[in-house]
Each structure stands twice: as C-alpha cells, then as structure tokens.
Amino acid sequence: MMNIIKIDNTQSGIFLERINKYLAKIYLNENVVDVHVHDPGRLKELLFKNNKVLVKKVNSTNRKTKYDLIAAKKEKEYVLVHSMYHRYIAEKILRKKYTHLKAEVKYKNSRIDFLAEDKFWIEIKGCTLSDGNMARFPDAPTKRGTKHLEDLMELKKQGFDTFIYFLIFANANYFSPNYETDLSFSKKLEEAYSLGVKIVPLLFSLENNWIVFKREIQLIFDG
C-alpha cells in the first residue's frame, strides 16, 4: 500500500439529485447547494438520493458552483468520483517506474495520456463501478475509449510497448470490461489484449482523506 494524494478539507453532505452530467444538488450544512461533478459517467450506483457524499469548497470567482463533488459512499467506503485526480494519481504511480514522462502527447487526431521514456505509450481510465468482487469499465458507452484502444493497437503494430491502466476506486478483486454497457469497447479491449497491449487494473481506496494505492488486481474477460 502507498499513500498517493491527500484531499484536505472535505465536508460530508447528502446527495439529492443530478441535474446534468456536470451539475448536482446536495444537502450541506442545512442548505441545498449546487456542486460540480467532474466525472461525466452515469455513476447511478453511487449518485442516488440520500446517499452520503464528500465535497470540497473551491475558491474561485469564475465558477457558478462553489463545491466539487469528491466521493460517494458505497457500503463501508467512499469511492472517488472526481476525475481530475486521475492524472495526478497515474503520474505518481508511473514516476515510480519511469524517469522521463510526457503528458497529453498528440498521436494523429488523439491525445494519449502519457509517453514514458519516449517509447512506452500509456492511456489512463478511471473506474468507479463494481459488481460484487468485479470492477467493470465503462459505466456508460465510450466511443472515445474505443478510439484510444485503436490508437494503442496501431502503436503496438508499429513496435511500441503500449499500456492501458484502469484506476479502480470501488473495492474489487477482479476487473472485466463491461460487456452489457459497451460491447464495442469490451470486444476491442479483448482484441487489444490479444495483440499485446498490456492491461493494468490497479485498486485504490480513499482512507482518512488519502487516496491509497492498494494493489494490482486480476484481469478477467467474462463476456
């Protein structure tokens, strides 16, 4: 286990409703307030009425909302739902392995999250959905995710080492693509794996305001 990032000054609230992809209402300190949702995924298993959430006040005069949604309760733990942290988490993990790291590297009409040592192409995806002991991605259809897989496969054919890291924030022992929600992405992930794209599912938790890296979990194709 390894502490990655500390998220200070969070406050507890009660989720009321999601207005759209990026806006929700919660009950906080005896008031109904608007909060910004950074993760555009469906998050239906986390963002439902009366569920407990964590938010953080943002000091900015350029925003309509004064709070960011940080995490939502699932059973005995909080699950991170703030996708802005994904890059910081991934970079902390990758810098343990690589010395030279470039972020947001252009490839044709896409941008790949990281290029390490000028030869390892790495894409990052955040996963908040778990079903029993199985984490699943995506929780909504993702054409962009499928395109990223196609890019990694193309780079692999050119002789590069390519990786897709899944940052898993809901407790699980296994990871599988979500065939029911996005069959196209799931089959493409199988194809990428067969071609030699490395799939790395990493489990994290939110403990005492720290995002904690726990371990790599097992990949299973169960579709």
UniProtKB/Swiss-Prot annotation:
One of its GO terms (molecular function) is DNA binding. PANTHER family: SUGAR FERMENTATION STIMULATION PROTEIN A. Belongs to the SfsA family. This is Sugar fermentation stimulation protein homolog. It comes from Thermosipho melanesiensis (strain DSM 12029 / CIP 104789 / BI429). The gene is sfsA.
